[in-house]
């Protein structure tokens, strides 16, 4: 029977290697990752749905009890023992009490703490911390016992690894999965590092539920437990564990930075951008307290030539880069002051090129293939470019200066993009081998064209008397820049439409899709209200950063209409989408009505309530049919079809030190 599914008793990797559970000498232990995938140092290849366990399923949580304390789950983890003494937990750091009181960075080479280290004074005891120790560990054990059962956590972690991590690249998947299995293997939790990792797991799971249901998982529950219940439980556990960790260890580590970022990303998915900004600020402060922004931490003083240590240090650099991208992008969009300075990121750029394992292709092609982190590096350089200009938005808009910056952007940034991310003719050779590469490409395009919009947006705020006072050549320049602004907004919406299609064209809480559906729509509506806007005539088109863009009133309003449709569809999931849809619809009505009364039927659109279906071919159609989503759970969530598709792989690579001296990261040698 076509579509018949059967239960699989091993992970997909073991199944293909015929290491079935029936073979007594080579048993797949069915954990995530399993013993064989861990031994092969390929934990990211471990893909399967765990079988049902005979435990009573939790009934859906009533709406009036959604905020109540969740019940403990017997199969979450074994009971942990309370640590016997302080030395077991390894929480004491040299002069931690002094650093906590004065706020010193403990790994500094120039502050007073550096002098005290040279004097070799005895450790300072923290009375407040000692008094809080027993009760804090009681809280930790209580929260750990409330974690959802492992099968649920395994599913969410697997979904995150294969479907979500490509977006922000906060963690390095192979090393995370290796630590994930080690964490589950522990008999008891007695170290703060393990509690921090538990907070990371909980917050990753809470974040992952924001993207469910999805085309690969169409139901709103996992193993009989509602997604809302799982989300609230994991969020509460993550928050309480994070608070406990900060109480026990003021300094923190990389893992703390990571789980704070995931907490911020979760509120971003909920449409609370102001809290997202505050969360990024908290992560930036945590990163500096932990010292991951420097190369003078304990890791660097150890065996510098050891590849494992160097990889671990590079993971820190990558997380810091991801944080810088979020900080730069948000500060530019929201007109805020960034938390991280440029010199910090220039000193901590990744030094390893991790070659992806993409199957049977020539070695030469593989070495030119983009790393999974290449898109983030493009985003880092984008932030460095715009922030390096030191622009002051308080100054009056100068068309000449904006034109100079635009030309510089073309020559210094766009001309140095990796071929797979080129604007005009990207190299799509490896799109099938790297399934997330097309999505990363659209994500970068959104950021690039949004930054061009940011460069020219102030021209819309010029008053008539300011425009009248401009020199004639500046008026001509201003007219062409209006056109560029409109074309850039169109390109943002085109990239958003393509990315949304790759997500299945369905409901999503991904803030990049929501935010960047709203902003360019507002820009286009504003531009279309200008009587002197230089629209293209007939079949003419204009070049923008090497690509031809046709800019007419009809095309612009059609793109806006589609953006509003998208916002209306996502309004049920996001307050940001709902409020954006309301404002955009009102502006749309205001823009369309004068045109309808003064011209033949250019657009016949409904602007009250729903806008109705689009009457013109959509930009989405040029991208073809919706991609097939690799199924993690469909029908029977713990069975697997015979023709299980191969998943995207970010395998344990062989680290290679870049021969380039930083901050230069461009060129064939790096990629």
Curated annotation (Swiss-Prot):
**One CC-aspect GO term:** nucleus
- According to its UniProt record, where is this protein located? Nucleus
Keywords recorded for this protein, A-Z: DNA-binding, Metal-binding, Nucleus, Transcription, Transcription regulation, Zinc
Name any one Pfam family assigned in the record.
Answer: Fungal_trans
Name the residue ranges with Basic and acidic residues bias. Answer: 77-90
- Asked whether the UniProt record includes Transcription among its keywords, one would answer yes
* Chain positions covered by the region annotation Disordered: 48-90, 629-650
Q: Which InterPro entries match?
A: Sec_Metabolite_Reg, Transcription_factor_dom_fun
Which molecular function GO terms apply here?
DNA binding; zinc ion binding
Q: Which one GO biological process term can you cite for this protein?
A: DNA-templated transcription
Bias (Pro residues) ranges: 49-62
* The keyword Ribosomal protein is annotated on this UniProt entry: no
- The UniProt annotation gives the DNA-binding region as 11-46
Location of region: Fungal transcription factor domain: 148-593
Q: Any idea what job this protein has?
A: Transcription factor; part of the gene cluster that mediates the biosynthesis of the 6-methyl-2-pyrone derivative xylariolide D. May play a role in the regulation of the expression of the highly reducing polyketide synthase xilA and the cytochroe P450 monooxygenase xilC.
Mind telling me what this protein is named?
Answer: Transcription factor xilB
UniProt source species: Penicillium rubens (strain ATCC 28089 / DSM 1075 / NRRL 1951 / Wisconsin 54-1255) (Penicillium chrysogenum)
